[in-house]
Amino acid sequence: MLRLQASLQRWRLLAAALLLPVPALGQPAPADQTDAGKQVFKRANCMGCHKWHGNGGGGYGGDALSLRKTELTREQIIETVGCGRPGTGMPFFTRGAYDSVKCHDMTREDVGAQIPPEANVFLRPNDVEAVADYVLARIKGRGEPNYSECVDFFGNASRVCDIYKAQQPLGGPTTSEKPQ
């Protein structure tokens, strides 16, 4: 009887351990939700249109809106990432958008020829939420991009940030402050 209880206890511990989140092989676990969102932002190639800094401009799908100047709420960002923007190049990242998932209160039939393109990769709901949290915490409401933000995005080894290094004020890197 004791042996059976010990065996059951080991199985419970193993089952509980399997439910713990494990980072992808070869990748460190994100420090917080915004770091996870930054990784999804990169993986989903949001920077292909919105650029690394979120200012937007010309991209593969046309002129992307500035995420720094957006007035969208968290819920609106989640819907826009998941469902795209009808009539624009902003793709949808949720599998089944406009089919099994109603988007912007519309179905595929409602949106017709204005259906957004399908993204190259679909995102899980928690990934879409992580991107929204990243945009709200690190992009929305910020001033012009700077060296510190660039290094935060690309790392110290990237030469991409050299242009911002020359622009930083004497005394070292600064960070853009979000307005209160």
Predicted regions and their residues:
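N-terminal secretory signal peptides that target proteins for export/translocation
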Residues: 1-9
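Short, cysteine/histidine-rich loop/knuckle motifs that typically chelate Zn2+
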Residues: 48
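His/Cys-centered metal/cofactor-coordination and adjacent catalytic loops
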Residues: 27-28, 66
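Structural motif
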Residues: 44-45, 85
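Flexible coil segments in periplasmic/lumen-exposed cytochrome c-class electron-transfer proteins
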Residues: 29-32, 43-44, 52, 91-180
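Bacterial N-terminal signal peptides
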Residues: 12-23
